[in-house]
Amino acid sequence: DTPYQAHVWMVNTGPHTGDLAWVMGAVTFTDLDSRPESEEHTEDWMKNVMPNVKKVSDGEYWKQDEKVSYSPEGSFTGKEIWTVYDIVPFEGYRFTALLENVVEVYKAKNYPNYFQVYRSQFDGGNGHDVAIGFGFKNYAFFDEDEKFWKDYEEVHGEGSRWKFFEEYREVVKGSYDELSEFMPELSSGE
């Protein structure tokens, strides 16, 4: 696997509905310093890609927080819910504690879906502080009864979800969801 892979996602809900999201990586900043450059690639990009782009928005750099992420083998499905959070300034450590509790449930219950946490590397002034990607296999998942909070209380004790909600209200200013689907035909890797 090369860090210079492009992944294209179609956004189906949320503020960017109908947009294509172009994602490069996983890549480090060090990788960016040595990425391949060629006049041929630049010309191809300008001639064949950019004429099809109506607008470019929200260029952001995100870094996965492995400590509060959960990615079991084979969990990539190509369908994902992204929730982007605006965290109260200087309360990120409290939000991280909430995420640690969530990941503990995923591990204890051996959930098949991934839960990947990313932190914005630069303040864009847009409230995009933390993004969580949650994978699911098919849309029928949304017809199933929600069992997470039942599992949460089995792991953390009766009434623990209400403590979670109280803490959440104090540290999260806002959030939004986007449902996206991976487009392998426009991507260079999974």
Located regions from the model:
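Short S/T/G/P-rich N-terminal loop/turn motif that feeds into the first structured element of a domain
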Residues: 1-190
